[in-house]
Amino acid sequence: MPYQCPITFNDEQLEICELKNQLEIFTQYQKSEFLNHHPVTDLVLLRSEYMDLLLNRLWEHFGFSKLPHIALVAVGGYGRGELHPLSDIDILIVSQRTLPSALGEKVSQFITLLWDLKLEVGHAVRTIAECIEIGSDDLTVATNLQESRLLCGSEDTFQELKLKIHSDSFWPSETFYKAKIQEQRERHARYHDTTYNLEPDIKSTPGGLRDIHTLSWVARRHFGATSLLEMSKYGFLTDAEYRELVECQDFLWRVRFALHIELRRYDNRLTFAHQAQVAEHLGYTGEGNRGVEMMMKEFYRTLRRVAELNKMLLKLFDQAIINGGQTQEAEILDNDFQRRGSLIEARKPALFQARPETILDMFIHIANDSTIEGVSPPTLRQLRTARRRLNRFLHTIPEARDKFMDLVRHPNALHKAFSLMHKLGVLSAYLPQWSQIVGQMQFDLFHVYTVDEHSIRLLKHINRFSQVENHDKHPICCEVYPRVQKKELLILAAIFHDIGKGRGGDHSEIGAVEAYSFCIEHGLSKPEAKQVAWLVQNHLLMSVTAQRRDIYDPDVITEFAKKVRDEESLELLVCLTVADICATNPELWNSWKRTLLAELFHSTQRALRRGLENPVDVRDRIRHNQQMASALLRKEGFSAREIEVLWQRFKADYFLRHTHTQIAWHCEHLLRLEDPSQPLVLISKKATRGGTEVFVYCKDQAALFATVVAELDRRNFNVHDAQVMVSKDGHVLDTFIVLDQHGEAIDEARHKAVAKHLTHVLADGRPTKIKTRRTPRNLQHFKVKTRVEFLPTKSKKRTLMELRALDTPGLLAQVGATFAELDINLHGAKITTIGERAEDLFILTSDAGGRLSEEQEQALRERLTEHVSELAP
C-alpha cells in the first residue's frame, strides 16, 4: 500500500523515536516511488510539503504559534519548495524584536530536536532589522531572503520582512544582477570554466542547477517572478526556452535525486564511486561501462544547453533591462552582418532560417577579425531557433560546403572560430557524425574530456605549433607545422580522428571511412582524401610505437617507417600525435614523452632518407657508440687499455641500447670503483630521455628487478623504461628511466638519499618484500581485467610480452618477482600508464637464454594473472 503523508502529527507521534521512524518510512517511500519512475518534480515538492507539515506541528508543539510577533520562514531551496533526500532544510526564525532569553532557550531546544532527528538544518534566529542589516552586506543571505516563504507564525512579521526585502534600497536590481554575475564567474572558475569535469558537481558546475537558479534569482529580483513559468510570462524567456529549461532541470533533478538516495551524507558530486549506481537507477544499461557513458553523455549535453541558455538570457537581460535597451552604434560588415562593439550580429531577424549557409559566413567574419569576441544575444537567440528548425544538416548545402572549407583553410580559424562553432552547436548542425560525439565520455581516468571537447582542444594545440613561444615545449612540431603546405589535411584529420567513438567497433577505422567520404564530398582530390583517411586510421600508431615498443630496435623502426611511407606523412602524423596527447589530459605531456616521440621521429626520418632497402648496420652503430664513448673517457684520463679491459666484460647489446654519453658516464664510475664486488648506483643529474636515469651495477641476484622497482615505488617514483643486462662475468648493468609522481625528473636534492638506500638494499643481497602503498581513491572504483599477451616478433631469441592491468601500487615489483619465481630473464621493459590502466611491454628469455616455450608462456600468464589480481583493491 502506498505511503500516505499524514495531514497532522498527533502527540504520540511527536516522540523522537516515532518521528525518526516516520522520517525513515517517508524516505524509503520516496526512494521506492523514484525507482518506480514517479515524476521527480512531484517527489521534490512532496518532500518540501512533508517538512512543512512536520515543522508546523513541532512549532505548535513548542507553543510558538501563540506568540504574536515571531514567524518560522523557509529560505533558500526549501523556500522554493525544492527538497531532495539530503537537501539542507534552511529556516529563519524571524521576530520584530530580540527574543527574551527564556524564549531564546526554547527556540534552541526546537533546533536541537531537528538535529536529533538527523535533519540537515541550516538556521538563523534574527530580528527583521538584523535580517536587513546582514543581508545588505551578504549576497548569499540576501539571495536566501529573496526566496523566503512563510511556514507558520506571525503573518504580519513575515509581510514586514518581505516589504523591506523588496524595497528598492535593499539590493537594487542592477546591483543584485552585477553581484550575481560576478558570483557566477567565480563559481565557474572553480570548475575551470567548463561543463566537462570527470566528477562534476550537479549543482555548482557550469551548466548545473545553480545556473538555472541564477536566472531565477535575477528575474525574481527585477520582475518579482517566483518560477520559471512566471519568467516566461514576463517575457524573460520565450515559451521554447521555458520548456527547454524545465526539461533540463527535470533531468538534473533526477540525477541529483538518484545520487542522494545512494549517499549517507550531503554531496552533489557525481563521483566515480556512484556514477554506475546512479546510471542504473535512471535506467541506463549496457555492457561494461556503457550505461555510465550513456548517462554522462546526456548529463554533459544537458549542462551545455543550460550554460548556453544562461549566458544568452543574462546578456539579453543586461542589454534590455540594465542598459535600458541602449546599444553601441553598429558597424556594417556586409549585407548580412554588422558588429556592435566586440560582438557580431545578423542584420535581418530571420537571416539564418532563410539562408542557413550564412551561419558559416558569420564564423568567417570571426576568423577574419580577431577583435570580434562573440555573438550578440539577439543573434544567438536567432541562431538557436534556426538550429532547431533545420530540416537537414548544413553539409548537404553546396554553398555551405564551400564556406566550411574556406574556414578549414583559414589561417586564423583554429584560434576562435572552430571553438565557437562547437560551443554554439554549429558543428553539430553541420556534421551528423559530430553531433553523435557531443558529450561522449569514457569511464576512465585517462580521457579527462568528452570526445567533442578533446577534439576542439586538439585543434587549438595544432594552432599553437605556429606560435614561436611554444618552440621549447614542442620543438619538432613548431619546426614542422609552419612548412606543411596543406594544413587543411591535418585539420580535417583532427576533426575526424575520434569521430567514430561510441558506436562500437574500431573508431579509427570508422573515422577513416567517414573522413574519406567527407573529403570527396568537399572537393578534395582522391590522394588528399586518402592522406586524411590514413592519418585518422593511424592516429594512434606513433604514440603506441613510441611508448609501447622498443624503438631502439632497428626492426621496429623499419616496420614503423614502412607504415608511414614518406616524410610528409611522418610530419603530419607527429603533429597530430603530439596535439592528440596534449588534448587528452593536461598531465600527459612531459619531457619523457617528448623525448620518446623525438627519437622515433628522427630515427624514422633517417630511415626514410636512407631508403628502407638500406637498413642501418647494427655493427656500425655499436662501433660508432664505442668510438664516441672512448673519446670521452680518454678525456677523463683513462687509457685505451683500461677501457678495453672493462668493455671485454660487456655484451654487444649494452653498446647498442645506450647512447655514447650514457656509456661514458657508466664506465667512468665503474673504472673508478675501488671495490668491484660492491654495488654501484648512479643517478643522473641531467635528464636522460626526458627522465632521471638510475643506473645499477652489482653481482646478479634473485629478483633484483623487483627489488629495485619496489624501492623506487616506495618513494612515489614511476619507472617508465628499463634496460636489464647481465655482463659476461655475471654482473647486472640495469638502467631505469624514472619520473616523479608529477611526471618530472627527480629533484636533485633527493638523489643522494635514494642512491645510498638502493646501494644498501643491493649490498644486503636479499629480495625486498613487496610492500604496496594504499591504492589511491580514484583507482578504487575501476575494474581492469588483467590480460597477458605474447606479441609476434621476428626474433628467435626473445619473447615480447604485453601486460594490461589496473595500475595498482606495487604492480611492477610483483611482475618482476613473478619472473624471478619462474626463472624467466627480463631484458627490457616499457612502462605505460593510461589513466587507471597499466599497459607494459617486457622483453623476456627463458633461463636457457632463448624464447619462452608455449608451456612457459601459459605458466607465466596464469601466475601473473593470479598475483596481479591479489593487488587489486
UniProtKB/Swiss-Prot annotation:
The keyword Magnesium applies. Belongs to the GlnD family. Keywords: Hydrolase, Magnesium, Multifunctional enzyme, Nucleotidyltransferase, Repeat, Transferase. Uridylyltransferase (UTase) activity is inhibited by glutamine, while glutamine activates uridylyl-removing (UR) activity. Its EC number is 2.7.7.59, 3.1.4.-. The keyword Magnesium applies. Residues 693-777, 800-873 form the ACT domain. Residues 1-332 are annotated as: Uridylyltransferase. This is Bifunctional uridylyltransferase/uridylyl-removing enzyme. One of its GO terms (molecular function) is [protein-PII] uridylyltransferase activity. Signal peptide: none annotated. Its cofactor is Mg(2+). One of its GO terms (biological process) is regulation of nitrogen utilization.
